[in-house]
């Protein structure tokens, strides 16, 4: 149900790759078993193994899947400027948007800590940035769906099930409603979100 796993599932769907998914029980420490550490010493999920080649970090996996299996480069164009904007959005998603989710919600969910209002402000600030990026834009980076949209829709949908009010951000809300319709694998993403919702 995690956002990074769902972004990989949607990207695989977009390029027509059938994933052989293996569920790891993190609470039971399955990601710390020697056989998994051999594949990924950083023991993070998702981890992709493609004919013996192991890769982790969801956004790196997304780019790899598109570069290796995409019929066209539309999800991650070869043009340096287009690609730079996509990369910026991916890093924004990882370092600002999704990070704000983790900083605010994870201590509450996993450590039963009280809500931190300062961390909540960081979420609002991240959404304000995203709202600005999306001004007059149908897509997050350029004029068509890219891996940036897929990563961001995985994150934004996670905020939705956590109860964050996305509708307060008009540009984000408009983009998100469209992304639900045009992102391959959306229904599987939403099913994963609903799994994740049990934590909130």
Curated annotation (Swiss-Prot):
<comment type="similarity">
    <text>Belongs to the GST superfamily. Theta family.</text>
</comment>
<keyword id="KW-0808">Transferase</keyword>
<comment type="function">
    <text>Conjugation of reduced glutathione to a wide number of exogenous and endogenous hydrophobic electrophiles. Has DDT dehydrochlorinase activity.</text>
</comment>
<dbReference type="GO" id="GO:0018833">
    <property type="term" value="F:DDT-dehydrochlorinase activity"/>
</dbReference>
<dbReference type="GO" id="GO:0006749">
    <property type="term" value="P:glutathione metabolic process"/>
</dbReference>
<dbReference type="InterPro" id="IPR036249">
    <property type="entry name" value="Thioredoxin-like_sf"/>
</dbReference>
<dbReference type="InterPro" id="IPR010987">
    <property type="entry name" value="Glutathione-S-Trfase_C-like"/>
</dbReference>
<dbReference type="GO" id="GO:0004364">
    <property type="term" value="F:glutathione transferase activity"/>
</dbReference>
<dbReference type="InterPro" id="IPR004046">
    <property type="entry name" value="GST_C"/>
</dbReference>
<comment type="subunit">
    <text>Homodimer.</text>
</comment>
<keyword id="KW-0456">Lyase</keyword>
<dbReference type="InterPro" id="IPR004045">
    <property type="entry name" value="Glutathione_S-Trfase_N"/>
</dbReference>
<dbReference type="Pfam" id="PF00043">
    <property type="entry name" value="GST_C"/>
</dbReference>
<feature type="binding site">
    <location>
        <begin position="43"/>
        <end position="45"/>
    </location>
    <ligand>
        <name>glutathione</name>
    </ligand>
</feature>
<feature type="domain" description="GST N-terminal">
    <location>
        <begin position="1"/>
        <end position="73"/>
    </location>
</feature>
<feature type="binding site">
    <location>
        <begin position="57"/>
        <end position="59"/>
    </location>
    <ligand>
        <name>glutathione</name>
    </ligand>
</feature>
<dbReference type="Pfam" id="PF02798">
    <property type="entry name" value="GST_N"/>
</dbReference>
<dbReference type="InterPro" id="IPR036282">
    <property type="entry name" value="Glutathione-S-Trfase_C_sf"/>
</dbReference>
<protein>
    <recommendedName>
        <fullName>Glutathione S-transferase 1-1</fullName>
        <ecNumber>2.5.1.18</ecNumber>
        <ecNumber>4.5.1.1</ecNumber>
    </recommendedName>
</protein>
<feature type="domain" description="GST C-terminal">
    <location>
        <begin position="79"/>
        <end position="200"/>
    </location>
</feature>
<feature type="binding site">
    <location>
        <position position="2"/>
    </location>
    <ligand>
        <name>glutathione</name>
    </ligand>
</feature>
